[in-house]
Each structure stands twice: as structure tokens, then as C-alpha cells.
Amino acid sequence: MSMPIPSRQLFIDGEWREPIKKNRIPIINPSNEEIIGDIPAGSSEDIEVAVAAARRALKRNKGREWAATSGAHRARYLRAIAAKVTERKDHFVKLETIDSGKPFDEAVLDIDDVATCFEYFAGQAEAMDAKQKAPVTLPMERFKSHVLRQPIGVVGLITPWNYPLLMATWKIAPALAAGCTAVLKPSELASITCLEFGEVCNEVGLPPGVLNIVTGLGPDAGAPLAAHPDVDKVAFTGSSATGSKVMASAAQLVKPVTLELGGKSPIIVFEDVDIDQVVEWTMFGCFWTNGQICSATSRLLVHESIAAEFIDRLVKWTKNIKISDPFEEGCRLGPVISKGQYDKIMKFISTAKSEGATILCGGSRPEHLKKGYFIEPTIISDISTSMQIWREEVFGPVLCVKTFSSEDEALELANDTEYGLASAVFSKDLERCERVSKLLESGAVWVNCSQPCFVHAPWGGIKRSGFGRELGEWGIENYLNIKQVTSDISNEPWGWYKSP
């Protein structure tokens, strides 16, 4: 499908501004490798201007235009944004599909979730009003204390390319609900919908500078944003390597960060399951979003007593996946995001083969697709736990398989990773599922499913998958400072020192 790609500038202080260095970055359609447009290439100079705009918006009129307003006031803007995104849903869905390569049906769900997220955090903003001046019980009657929840300030939001607008929304919505102002730096590999979102902000009358959007390369725009002394907090989603750099930059200024990083999530399948039902969930857990999910359950652990039958059914189901242009009806696997990502995934597969692993299906480009960054969904067996393919995040449609003989062995294999974002367990024995859930070392556990994610529930990892929680009531807390206010309500002197 061909469609015109809007040509935008940087969105700063409520205006469209050309990058100071006037550079642009080409947009490549991952489905056919053609250049379909370009985005502005922001630099540290543009970040400087954007952060200054966010700081002015935070402080303007002593915060009475945004930061110090009621949550209910800010909620009206968030609901207006949700309505506008829904109104322009078809436009956003098409742009997300062509830019990221994800199947059209998935992009529809993503944009629905964007609107849902703004609606949800509008409710959280309103609920925050009732929590203001929450009393604190003290042991001395002479004193009275309460708590204020106040925006943390100017926040830098650095977001990935696998869910371009949705992952940005996970950060924008709670930050704005809390009363923060923000500078968003989306991934240069998929920025179109984030730039278009700037137009939505103008259409709903969001005060200038409350949200600023600077596209560009990570070293040129993302790194200066993370290190900027006038940014009060950084929230980052991306690779563990880049997350470490963000954390190091923030550490120089003792600046709080929230990091949602990589994963190598396990999926444990016990012997008492409905095989076809769990096969489908296994595929969904690894091949959804073309395999490019930080929480992908890409390490399959299946009980040895059903392994042969399960893997046979899994391979047959996987070979039946429709791989095509993401706009084609029924597409269930599109291209990966870029040539660099394509080459990286293929190198993982070739290394696995050289280390002695067996490719049960996939592992190459689909024969019917000569252009585009398409990779067949790949299942790999005969794996040792020391192999690269088992230990490192691939971020593509690649599933590794091992067997286990006992619950203890399954848990040992599942937890033997430096990551801890998510896990899944399948069994008809719900007591076993509950027991295993408590012992899995991850920020999220799915029981008899994989990948469902709701704005109402907390999201985040442990270990090298990061820290902090997004979404739910925990999401807005990320962007708040808690201040205690304690008053002496007695008319009596304190009496600690003798009067002269």
C-alpha cells in the first residue's frame, strides 16, 4: 500500500520548528526497502531549546497553567487527546503499519490502546485530587501533618520503535496526568506517528511547551536529553546497553530514572495442557509484533513427556503463519524494522547453527518475498544453556526450545538469565501455576497465556530488565514527588532553649 507520508518538523513550544542544523533522516518502508519520506534530525541544540520550552511551561504563571492545576483540569486535556486519536484512528493505524512493518490488525489494537491509555490516566489525574493533603497520623498532638503529591518537573522520555506511539503514550499520559512537562525523543526508526501526535496536541489546545517532540539519532538527541541538567527525570525503554548509558548519565546529576529494558523471557509448559491451545499461545508470545517485543517469551521449556508431540504441532502451526506485506488481509508476520535488525537476527541464527543447534523451521527469508526485511518465524532446538541464542535477546521471530523433567528443573532453567521482565507458565493445575508464579524471577507472570498487557496493571522488570513500574496507579507515581507538610498547631512555646 502506498500513501503520502506527512512531512513534519520538530514540535517545540507548540510550534513546528526546523532543526537548527537543518538535517533530515530518511524513512525506509521495511516492507519494500524504499525511502518513503524523512523526519527531522534533531541535535543537542534542539534538545536545549525543547528543554527550555518545557521548563517555561512548568513554571509559567507559577505553574497555574499546568503543573499546579488540579488533576481534573489536566484530565480534560487527556480525554480530548483520547477522543482526537480515536477520531483520526485510521490515519494513525496506516502510518504505524507502513512505518514499523507490524501487521495492520496489530496496529489497530495499538492505536485503540493509545486512546485507552489517555482515558485511563485522565481518571488517575482526577483521583490524585482526592489524595492531595492526605493526613499523616503523628504521635504528638501538637503537630499536624499531610502529604502533597507534586509533579517531579521536566521529564525526558526516550521511547522505542516496536510500539512507536503506544510506548510513547505509556510515558506521556502519566507524566502529563501528574503535571509534568516533557520532551519526547522517539526512535529514529519509527517516528512518524509520534510527530503526528504533535498535531493532536495543538488541536486540543495543550499549552505550549507541555509536550515537545524531538526526533533524531540516539547519540545526537537522546544522549543530550538524558544528560541535560534541567531535566528532572528520564524514562527510557530500549536495550539494556543503552539503558546503562542513560543510567550513567543520570547518575552524574543524581537524577531518577525509570528503565524498561531487554528480556529473554521463559515460557514453561507442563504435561497436563491442551496442546493446540498452548501451541497458539506459545506462537503469540514470541511472534507477535514480528517477534520484536521486549517481553517475548522466546525460551520455551516443555515437559519431556509431551515434548515430541508439542514441538511437532508447534512447527506445523508456525509454518502456517501468513507472512506478507502488513497491509494484506490476514497478515500475521511482517518485516522486522530495519536492515540492521535483519542482519543482526540472521547472525544470531547462523551462530546458533554453527554452535550445533537445529533449525526446526524458518531461519531464512521467505521465498515469496524478495524485498523487505522479512524473516520466517524460526524454531530452534538442540540447545545448550551456554549458547548465545539461549542467553541473549534476539528481538526477532526466533523461539528456542528445551525440555525439562521436573518443576524444579523448569524453574532453574527459567530463572537462569540476567533478565527478568516477564514469564509464562501453562498448566491445568492452578495450585502449581500459583506456586511457580511466586518463584519465577520477573516483573510480570502470565498464567495460561502470554503477552496480554493492560494499562490498569503495573509493568516493569527486575535484574537487567530494568526497574520502576509503568502503567496502573504505579505509572503516575513515577512522575510525582511526595512532600510532607508538618505544622505546629499549638500556641505554646517549644521550650527547648532557655530565654535570655
From Swiss-Prot:
- Check the record and name the CDD domains matching this protein: ALDH_F10_BADH
Residue numbers annotated as active site: E260, C294
- InterPro entries named among the record's database cross-references: Ald_DH/histidinol_DH, Ald_DH_C, Ald_DH_CS_CYS, Ald_DH_CS_GLU, Ald_DH_N, Aldehyde_DH_dom
Q: What is its EC number?
A: 1.2.1.8
Q: Tell whether 4Fe-4S is among the UniProt keywords.
A: no
List the Gene Ontology MF annotations in alphabetical order: aminobutyraldehyde dehydrogenase (NAD+) activity; betaine-aldehyde dehydrogenase (NAD+) activity
Task: Give site residues, Transition state stabilizer.
Answer: N162
User: What's the main place this protein lives?
Assistant: plastid
Pathway stated in the Swiss-Prot or TrEMBL entry: Amine and polyamine biosynthesis; betaine biosynthesis via choline pathway; betaine from betaine aldehyde: step 1/1
Question: Which Pfam families does this one have?
Answer: Aldedh (PF00171)
FT transit peptide:
1-7
Reactions that this protein is recorded to catalyse: betaine aldehyde + NAD(+) + H2O = glycine betaine + NADH + 2 H(+)
- What residue ranges are annotated as transmembrane? none
Record keywords: Transport included? no
Q: Which family does this protein fall into?
A: Belongs to the aldehyde dehydrogenase family.
Instruction: Please give the name of this protein.
Output: Betaine aldehyde dehydrogenase, chloroplastic
